[in-house]
Amino acid sequence: MTDLRSDTIRKGYERAPNRSLLRSLGVTDREIELPFIGIANAFNTIVPGHTHLRQLSDKVKEGIAAAGGVPFEFGVIGICDGIAMGHEGMRYSLPSRENIADSIELMVQAHRFDGLVCVGTCDKIVPGMLMAAVRTNIPTIVVTGGAMLPGSSGGKDLSLIDVFEGVGKVAAGTMEEDALKELECCAMPGCGSCQGLYTANTMACMTETMGMSLPGCAAVPAVEAAKLRIARESGEAIIPLVKKNSTARDIVTKKSLENAIRVDMALGGSTNTVLHLMAIATEAEIPLSLADFNRIADEIPHICHMLPAGPYSMQALYRAGGIPAVLKRLEKHLDDCPTVSGLSLYQVARNAMIKNEQVIRSLDAPVSPAGGLRILFGSLAPDGAVVKSAAVPKEIWKHTGPARVFESEEPAMAAILSRQIHEGDAVIIRNEGPRGGPGMPEMLSATSALMGVGYKNVVLITDGRFSGGTRGPCIGHVAPEAAVGGPIALVQDGDRIAVDLFMRTIDLLVDPEVLTSRKAAWKPVMRPVTGVLARYAKTVGQANLGAVLR
């Protein structure tokens, strides 16, 4: 074993004060010579995906101790995007990713941990942990907390998206409030991340594909005993990584990130993965561009029809063999890469079984011949925009219509629920980007309202984000954003907007001279914010680069 980072705080007579403090924690003479492993635990009692993490972290500790290490646990914040949705709180969600990365870096570097096990589940927590892992570049394993079991009512499986869309149905008069109350009470039966292939679960799948979680981790439900076993085995597995000094950047490489994108395309994952994978690549100093996503989308078919686009929950994916089974299906398209388990990605794939051919379809009978995400470019989004094409009906892949412009989500939501939006419209919600929001809030309330009210031919375009639970023709991450003078800032009511998912284009059909005149008169709309949002707005970059702090 090479010299340990933790030797800095415990070797030599000069470190007697440091050792004295360690002894005050109960560290023994034997333990003071062993590898010190940090456990970044995002447990709290407000996020359903995190209420069970203390139990998982305890298992990680057991594994570390059994393998010859000393565990030291510390806390990490976590925000529930569902609870934060639809109000001012959503502006704080994406900034929390940077806080998580920063706080883990602070703990790892101050205490000179030799290795790190991250225990987290939800949308911004796991990306923040991965950003910290590649930034600090020490041996790291991520234990994702797992999905909640589906809810049930009348023999139908439910997820949180049923409740969000129920709000729109009540507004449209197609559902009674009593029925919505039943959904509210039945949809979310316990701990774990929301049940479909939303952002949290997609990022868990990306983490496993990159090689940063043990095989099978992503799809195991939160309440399964298998999750406890994986947590303990992850604690055991970190010690060999420390002894070999196999660091996070040995695992997270350009090839492993591209493997993650391939699985993302096959699953039809959340648009937020584009933002997070770009951010992880930036932290790891790996060249990755939005063009890479389009290139890979052309190579990989969409083979898993997962919620919200299709009928299958994460529980169904687990029963079908989980991510190892997806890797088996895609093996010929993947690059072989190391994983934290000690197995190569090909070995993981070859050890797997595909247990349900309907959930994990063959490459010859896909849901769609192209991957589930598309990056659009054009005069409205010169630096790109993202759409979950897997969740858009083919009949609206090509759309031209008049713009209905809103300066924030709230008035757009009111217009949707009051049916002031007309079929054929292109709803523009701007000044919701990384800097303009600030915080690039998600628009799940608005998109779910569109679905619930029953619009069939309306597209929604924003410089903000969408939830992984969003379905329908919803285009986000428009870059440059309105707050920095991007073309979306110049759109006026009635302007013609042309979207073509087949050609991957998004255009503002206005004479360039008119746009030049508008740009000369344009002034940025900046919301008055204080504290963390004020600091964030000053330093955050654009969505096409991952919205990382500069």
From Swiss-Prot:
Pathway: Amino-acid biosynthesis; L-isoleucine biosynthesis; L-isoleucine from 2-oxobutanoate: step 3/4; Amino-acid biosynthesis; L-valine biosynthesis; L-valine from pyruvate: step 3/4. Belongs to the IlvD/Edd family. One of its GO terms (molecular function) is magnesium ion binding. The modification N6-carboxylysine is found at residue 124. Pfam families: ILV_EDD_C, ILVD_EDD_N. [2Fe-2S] cluster binds at residues 122, 194. Its EC number is 4.2.1.9. The lineage of its organism: Archaea, Methanobacteriati, Methanobacteriota, Stenosarchaea group, Methanomicrobia. Binds 1 [2Fe-2S] cluster per subunit. This cluster acts as a Lewis acid cofactor. Signal peptide: none annotated. The active site is at residue 467. NCBIfam families: ilvD, PRK00911.1. This is Dihydroxy-acid dehydratase. It comes from Methanoregula boonei (strain DSM 21154 / JCM 14090 / 6A8). Its cofactor is [2Fe-2S] cluster; Mg(2+). Functions in the biosynthesis of branched-chain amino acids. Catalyzes the dehydration of (2R,3R)-2,3-dihydroxy-3-methylpentanoate (2,3-dihydroxy-3-methylvalerate) into 2-oxo-3-methylpentanoate (2-oxo-3-methylvalerate) and of (2R)-2,3-dihydroxy-3-methylbutanoate (2,3-dihydroxyisovalerate) into 2-oxo-3-methylbutanoate (2-oxoisovalerate), the penultimate precursor to L-isoleucine and L-valine, respectively. It catalyses: (2R)-2,3-dihydroxy-3-methylbutanoate = 3-methyl-2-oxobutanoate + H2O; (2R,3R)-2,3-dihydroxy-3-methylpentanoate = (S)-3-methyl-2-oxopentanoate + H2O. Keywords: 2Fe-2S, Amino-acid biosynthesis, Branched-chain amino acid biosynthesis, Iron, Iron-sulfur, Lyase, Magnesium, Metal-binding. GO terms for cellular component: cytosol. It is an enzyme of class 4 (lyase). SUPFAM superfamilies: IlvD/EDD N-terminal domain-like, LeuD/IlvD-like. It comes from the Archaea. Homodimer. Gene3D superfamilies: IlvD/EDD C-terminal domain-like.
